[in-house]
């Protein structure tokens, strides 16, 4: 009898639920649509940023202490499209109250990225572009970028204008367009190799630049390097090689890493906006040591020391020093 009573009660409850659902179906549907729309919009915009305090000095030179702050907005347009905008203060010297020493907020990233499935994406606007391993260029680029690939091999084509480094401050008429092709592939479990070609649409001798790069990581050991050249232009080779040890991750307190690199760039090397922190980018050769340490989660200290630098004729160049205190949020 008890089981029959429970069955009857359950049946009556279900019947009541069905009647209420039928009676208020429109209201429930409207509420459901509104809730779904709200859920779709929750978390659509992600805000991140970073701040940096930097100290620079060199032998027989005046030291400089400057700062920079950046805020980035990543907006989810739909499940395949993202829009990104980043504001930056630029580098401003602390203690300099003149107009040129003040922070000047501007947009240095503004682009849309659309995914065509899992292996193809297209980016357009103002974004960061890297050529090869970054020895020649790792900076701001206005144009379009196509990416195709998977976990083992990646091909990238970009067309547009370099607008940072030596290309900063140029008008559109003064600037030139670049067609960049990068190809990178994984070799085994630990190594990546890549090559690039950069076609520069201008009339002088620097029109075709190519290069190769490689990186290998074995647990905490890193070995890597890059070589590049402008074809049909003498004294245009540049290369770097280095070795490092550690597991530095700015997100994890207490992690650290050390690195030593050698750089050699001829007088006409096509270095526009390098990814590295050495101050002599052409007609120079020398060493740079780097130490990274995560003081706290998302707080990192980086120190660089450049030593034994000379020009290509063997004349000494000044040692240089740099320390960055970086904050991520």
Task: Describe the predicted segments one by one.
Residues 32-39, 110, 147-152, 282, ...:
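Short, Lys/Arg-enriched charge-dense amphipathic segments
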Residues 44-46, 50-56, 62-168, 173-194, ...:
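Outer membrane beta-barrel
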Residues 1-52:
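N-terminal periplasmic/intermembrane-space "pro-region" immediately following the signal or transit peptide
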Residues 8-15, 19, 35, 54-64, ...:
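Outer-membrane beta-barrel pore domains
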